Amino acid sequence: MDPGYINSYGKTLFKYLSDYYWRIEASGLENIPGHGSGILAGMHRGFMPWDGVMALHLVVSKTGRYPRFLTHSGLLKFPFLANFMTKLGGVVACQQSAERILSSGELIGIFPEGIRGAFTRYREAYKLQGFGRDTFVKLALQHRAPIVPFVTVGSAEIFPIFAKIESKCWTRYTEWPCIPITPTFPLLPIPLPSKWHTRFLPPMDVAREYSPEAAQDRAIVRAISREVRAKMQQAVDEMLARRRSIYHGSVFKSEEVA
């Protein structure tokens, strides 16, 4: 991670994208822990890492903390993305990386749906996929770290996936499950200027209710995971119900916006 690099882009490219291109409105940033470890569990759409980058920008600019996001190894196979993501603090998504970050008292960003969420077809973009092995819950229990779920409405529209092309060669090289077909990708990989709304939900302090040993209890881990997913889905549904346009308007009350 290079804080100077992040701060430089935070005043230029990231600020432009956040404030003018996607016009991001954020709510609940006060829920980010001011110190110590914590897990930011998000919903990733659009297959490119822009929603993670914008979440990083929001947290850094509003709280001064620098979360490290777990990054799919496929993104790091592209040289121009590998350097970019590494300087932003991205680390290869694996348990060892997560353990190291949490043990250092840092924030970690995780997308529990995994790569399936990133490649969700647009017609199902705002229905959360399954959370896989629930490793993020086990990490929260073992490291006594609060879980802060967060969701974004609007990021699915930057590269809305209408079709997928299966290609073994493409998958072998990129580790992507398919070639996504959107209005602009792959012919012109420019994201669309949709309006974004990001909400950070109240932290779930699992350490208050469970001991670290609970990480070995499959039933407890699954129950916590389902609770996280349910809260995220409820937040998404509420935001969608308030959204009147993909490109304009707000889903938050004025006092909710950071």
Regions found by a protein language model. Give the residues of each.
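Membrane-anchoring hydrophobic helices of lipid-metabolizing enzymes
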Residues: 1-58, 63-96, 237-258
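Non-catalytic C-terminal accessory region of glycerolipid acyltransferases
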Residues: 1-9, 100-258
